[in-house]
Amino acid sequence: RANSHSNLELFTTLSHEGFPGHLYQTVFFGRTQPADIRYLITSGGYVEGWATYVESYGYQYAASLLTDKAASDLTALMWKNRCINLCIYSLLDTGIHYQGWNQTAALRFLQVFGIRDTKIASEIYQYIVETPCNYLKYYLGYLNFLDLKKKQQEKSGSSFDVREFHRKV
């Protein structure tokens, strides 16, 4: 399975961009017949948070289909790695745009997490400088969905229905 990593990437990208991600989200929204103004106003954290949240289900589902325990564990690890990257880039974004980090400070921060190649670190820095708050939409939005789910689980107890939760959010 030389291309199994690329298959996983395709599968989880489709989870994020297609169904149950943005495609589902957009079609569902359109079927609610919202006021026209709602098409002009959007919340990036909600939109990307939902897509990242359901992407996590894509990884979980992919892992559950694998009969090889090592491959299943690797798939779960890849989701954790994606979360860590989103978190690191979100923290870096906050450091640059809120705390005023220059490139040297940002590179030092990335080195703590093992990103030592200065060319790669510089590219990450430049991308975040040029797209402020981009990663925050994905990661904080995702964390907000996890918080909503946890609160609903606590409120509902044993009657919690994940499908109903997804329908409401």
Regions found by a protein language model. Give the residues of each.
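Long, His/Glu/Asp-enriched segments that create or flank divalent metal/ion-associated functional microenvironments
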Residues: 1-169
